[in-house]
């Protein structure tokens, strides 16, 4: 799932749902820059939620554009609070995590040429000795898919599309474009070559839009507030 945007009832739901899964993946925009709650306060609360989730499941958390909180050592914006949240059961920006033949690579939202190169280097390093399956967390959806269309305009990430072509991951989890699954001609899933790309979308409701992946049955179950779909992988 992605784009919770500091909607605390959705985080509460996620903590309860974590009882039934092995891994929780949140693909960007945990915080919300237009919320009346100061960003510095939001991140304190969000770190507590990450800790609660980590008591129940492995947590993978990638940053989105709303999560940036200041310049890194290179002068480009990073989600410093999220990087500081990493721990034994919480895997964040810039890391990879291997379990049961699957590698999860968690990419940060990049803000300029230096952080873009950091992502390129991260993916190249993670490609070495890759296991049977490789999954990326990357907030923005790639060019060449319906996942980057909001019904009026496209917001394609050409760099991600190029990296997918170069490395051929099995699955990329994205977000960012909230309306993508529900616009005319839209969807929550797409293919680029042999790579599946998912964007669960974001809508109001007591339960957030989310995707549950069963790696034994090789299925993806999308809950889309008004819709539901099961996909064979």
Predicted regions and their residues:
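Binuclear metal-dependent phosphoesterase catalytic core
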Residues: 96-100, 166, 180-233
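Short, conserved loop/helix-junction motifs that constitute active-site signature segments
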Residues: 18-19, 50-56, 128-130, 164-167, ...
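Active-site-proximal beta-strand elements of phosphoester/diester hydrolases
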Residues: 1-5, 101-110, 135-139, 196-202, ...
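Conserved catalytic scaffold of divalent metal-dependent phosphoesterases
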Residues: 32, 67-162
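Active-site neighborhood of phospho(di)ester-bond hydrolases with catalytic His/Asp-centered motifs
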Residues: 1-3, 24-29, 58-65, 91-93, ...
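Active-site environment of divalent metal-dependent phosphoester hydrolases
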Residues: 5-10, 31-35, 62-73, 96-98, ...
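Cap/insert and terminal regions of metallo-dependent hydrolase folds
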Residues: 26, 31-52, 147-185
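Core catalytic region of metal-dependent phosphoesterases/phosphodiesterases
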Residues: 6-98
């Amino acid at each position: 799932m992605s784009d919770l945007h500091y909607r605390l009832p959705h985080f509460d739901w996620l903590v309860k749902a974590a009882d039934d899964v092995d891994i929780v993946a949140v693909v960007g925009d945990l915080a919300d820059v237009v919320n009346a709650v100061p960003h510095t306060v939001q991140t304190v609360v969000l770190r507590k939620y990450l800790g609660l989730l980590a008591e129940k499941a492995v947590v993978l958390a990638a940053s989105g554009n709303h999560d940036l909180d200041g310049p890194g050592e290179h002068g480009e914006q990073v989600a410093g609070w999220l990087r500081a949240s990493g721990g034994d059961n919480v895997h964040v920006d810039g890391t990879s995590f291997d379990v049961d033949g699957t590698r999860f690579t968690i990419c940060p939202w990049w803000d300029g040429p230096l952080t873009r190169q950091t992502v390129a280097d991260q993916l190249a390093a993670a490609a070495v000795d890759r296991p049977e399956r490789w999954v990326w967390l990357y907030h923005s959806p790639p060019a060449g898919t319906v996942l980057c269309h909001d019904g009026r305009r496209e917001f394609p990430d050409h760099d991600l599309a190029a990296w997918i072509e170069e490395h051929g991951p099995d699955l990329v989890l994205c977000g960012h474009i909230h309306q993508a699954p529900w616009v005319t001609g839209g969807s929550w899933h797409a293919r680029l070559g042999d790579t599946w790309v998912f964007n669960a979308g974001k809508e109001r409701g007591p339960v957030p839009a989310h995707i549950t992946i069963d790696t034994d049955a090789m299925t993806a179950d999308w809950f889309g507030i008004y819709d539901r779909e099961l996909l064979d992988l």
